[in-house]
Amino acid sequence: MVEPIFKPGDYIINRSAGDMAIIDKVTKKNYYHFKNYYGGMFNEFKNVEDKSYDLQVNYQKFFDLCNEEEKKKLDELIKNRGK
């Protein structure tokens, strides 16, 4: 079993796809749930409100922690969401 490397509150990014997210929690079944998940391919936020969009811990290898510039970019996208 793969142990989670990210923790709640971490900003993560898949640099090849452009996906960015803020982790809300890691479940006992090793799924990440998100406060926000921005899909870079379609430039849209995924529906995380009903917890139907999650990520298995096994896929964390495709993600890295965001640097400060990337965090600011995601915060700006969240701020302007729906405008």
Task: Identify what each model region corresponds to.
Residues E3-R15:
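Short coil-to-beta transition motif at edge beta-strands of beta-rich domains
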Residues G18, I22-K46:
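Basic/aromatic-rich interaction segments and small domains that mediate binding to polyanionic partners
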Residues Y38-K83:
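Intrinsically disordered, low-complexity, charged/polar segments
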